[in-house]
């Protein structure tokens, strides 16, 4: 089998001066790029130059870039500051909500706080205390078991803090939970994707949710209808209030002026109802603004018109009530799919009726590999439990020595990978609990978490070594993965060629092993207590309603001898 290119440069015989020249060139290009970014930042927000000296660019994400800077204090010494530059296209309400999360919940209990904030036009820079930290991947296999306990304990302290304020972080992962191993300091950072619970104490998060709901409604304003002529687009039906609201253009109608005689509300509403063409209906009563009829003819026609309009109003009210009832029935059908369903429910096909429905809108923000089952299945009611699932995935990586543990290209593949560990039947039952129907072509049994983690960490000498990937990268037990979706198998095989694999070597048989200079710390790993896997099981509970909370996790027996 052809050897991955990531490992071809590890052998001394293959090295040549061109490799070193290429590395130097890439390094110079990177440094020049960082220098250019710093110059552009100082130009965009010139007041930064008066306060900070920007040293380096230490991070970059989809919505922001982070720089290391120093501030000259009055006492004479320098203080390191992390400057987070938000992309100019960020919504002002989203920026304000992130700032409020940092000021209200931050600054204690391992949650990053806020020092300053600068703005120039559409550029916003948040200044926060700088915490020097290690890369999670670099220290993963050198952490002692006690360090893992401390890491998880402090993560739950931070999550308990933000959950008390009704903040759902949505992006809990190792790179957002900074860890200084030497100082034993921790910090939960990046509230750019944060959302509020229904009773959140962060007022601006309520507005962020309402803004998101309005955007979702506007995206669903036009939905497809499948018929014999193909896919058509039509506007969503108006609500009852919208249908009953008089339009200002009606006031220009002569018909209204002609009918309107008194000041009572009834005749006014009759007059408004005459000009029905405003609501998209044909009107056969439009006539010239100059009338040549006698008063008697006018009176007779008026009485007839009033009778006709009264009947129309009664019909309209019936139609409105019918539409309202249909709307309620649609909502009921959506919430109770087992009662009101179509022919394709519970099968592996999708009918034209389902294809014509609006796409279900639900928050999906987060990092692939750390998103909970309810996020992957677009459950609209998402709570702080999604953060606890992400914490469980981190704990799974720490216990197994594999990172990232899950790595999928799409939501269905990610769900299939979760089934590989937690079981297909259990996943289906949990999905049913929060109103989702999940189908799996083959039944995949749930794995024993202790056996899985020990096998992946290499503590079980009776289990053959895995050829799928090195320690530090996600891999699955071949016996379990053979029952999964072919997408999951394809993703699993691709992980062996990840760039991070260059930290490990492969022997002649094709198996991965630690390099000799790897400082693996085996302290405590030979006797991991059952409480660790019990906590892991509760964190990876597929049902968000019964998943353990951060407050309950801190009281778990796994942390019984740690101070609160």
Curated annotation (Swiss-Prot):
Q: Pfam families of this UniProt entry? A: Pkinase
Transmembrane region(s): none
Reaction(s) the record says it catalyses: L-seryl-[protein] + ATP = O-phospho-L-seryl-[protein] + ADP + H(+); L-threonyl-[protein] + ATP = O-phospho-L-threonyl-[protein] + ADP + H(+)
Disordered as annotated region, ranges: 460-506
**Biological process GO annotation list?**
cell cycle phase transition; cell division; positive regulation of cell population proliferation; positive regulation of G2/M transition of mitotic cell cycle; positive regulation of nuclear cell cycle DNA replication
Subcellular localization is given as:
Nucleus
Q: Where does ATP bind?
A: 58-66, 84
Q: A Gene Ontology MF term for this entry?
A: protein serine kinase activity
- First-tier enzyme category under EC: transferase
> What cofactors does this protein use?
Mg(2+)
Q: Which residues carry this modification: Phosphoserine?
A: 21
**Record's function text:** Kinase involved in initiation of DNA replication. Phosphorylates critical substrates that regulate the G1/S phase transition and initiation of DNA replication, such as MCM proteins and CLASPIN.
What is this protein identified as? Cell division cycle 7-related protein kinase
Source organism of the structure:
Mus musculus
């Amino acid at each position: 089998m052809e050897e991955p290119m990531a490992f071809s440069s590890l052998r001394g015989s293959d090295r040549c001066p061109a490799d070193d020249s290429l590395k130097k060139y890439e390094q110079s290009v990177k440094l020049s790029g960082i220098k250019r970014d710093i110059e552009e930042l100082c130009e965009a927000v010139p007041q930064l130059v008066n306060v900070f000296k920007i040293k380096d660019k230490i991070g970059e994400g989809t919505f922001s870039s982070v720089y290391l800077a120093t501030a000259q204090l009055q006492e004479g010494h320098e203080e390191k500051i992390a400057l987070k530059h938000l992309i100019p296209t960020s919504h002002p309400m989203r920026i304000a909500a992130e700032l409020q999360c940092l000021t209200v919940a931050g600054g204690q209990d391992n949650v990053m706080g806020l020092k300053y904030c600068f703005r120039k036009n559409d550029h916003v820079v948040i200044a926060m205390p700088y915490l020097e930290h290690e890369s999670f991947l670099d220290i993963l296999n050198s952490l002692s078991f006690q360090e893992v306990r401390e890491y998880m304990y402090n993560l739950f302290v931070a999550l308990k803090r933000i959950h008390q304020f009704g903040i759902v972080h949505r992006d809990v992962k190792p790179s957002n939970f900074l860890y200084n191993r030497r100082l034993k300091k921790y910090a939960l950072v990046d509230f750019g994707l944060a959302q509020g619970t229904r009773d959140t104490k962060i007022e601006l998060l309520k507005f962020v949710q309402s803004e998101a709901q309005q955007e979702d409604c506007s995206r669903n304003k036009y939905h497809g209808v499948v018929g014999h002529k193909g896919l058509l687009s039509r506007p969503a039906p108006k609500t009852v209030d919208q249908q009953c609201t008089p339009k200002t253009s009606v006031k220009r109608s002569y018909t209204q002026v002609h009918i309107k005689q008194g000041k009572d509300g009834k005749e006014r509403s009759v007059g408004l109802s005459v000009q029905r063409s405003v609501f998209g209906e044909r009107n056969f009563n439009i006539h010239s603004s100059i009338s040549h009829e006698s008063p008697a003819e006018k009176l007779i026609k008026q009485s007839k018109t009033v009778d006709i309009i009264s009947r129309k109003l009664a019909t309209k009210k019936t139609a409105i009530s019918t539409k309202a009832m249909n709307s309620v029935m649609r909502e009921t059908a959506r919430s109770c799919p087992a009662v009101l369903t179509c022919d394709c429910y519970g099968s592996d096909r999708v009918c034209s009726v389902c294809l014509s429905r609006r796409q279900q809108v639900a928050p999906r923000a987060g990092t692939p590999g750390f998103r909970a089952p309810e996020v992957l299945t677009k459950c609209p009611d998402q709570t702080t439990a999604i953060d606890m699932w992400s914490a469980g995935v981190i704990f799974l990586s720490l216990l197994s020595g594999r990172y990232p543990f899950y790595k999928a290209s799409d939501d269905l593949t990610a769900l299939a990978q979760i089934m590989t560990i937690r079981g297909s039947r259990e996943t289906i039952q949990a999905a049913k609990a929060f109103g989702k129907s999940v189908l799996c072509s083959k039944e995949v049994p749930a794995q024993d978490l202790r056996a899985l983690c020990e096998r992946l960490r290499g503590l079980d000498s009776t289990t053959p070594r895995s050829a799928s990937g090195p320690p530090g990268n996600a891999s699955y037990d071949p016996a379990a993965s053979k029952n999964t979706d072919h997408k999951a198998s394809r993703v699993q095989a691709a992980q062996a060629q990840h760039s991070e694999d260059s930290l490990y070597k492969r022997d002649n048989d094709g198996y991965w092993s630690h390099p000799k200079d790897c400082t693996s710390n085996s302290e405590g790993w030979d006797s991991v207590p059952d409480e660790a896997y019990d906590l892991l099981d509760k964190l990876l509970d597929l049902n968000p309603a019964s998943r353990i909370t951060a407050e309950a996790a801190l009281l778990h027996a796994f942390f019984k001898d740690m101070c609160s």
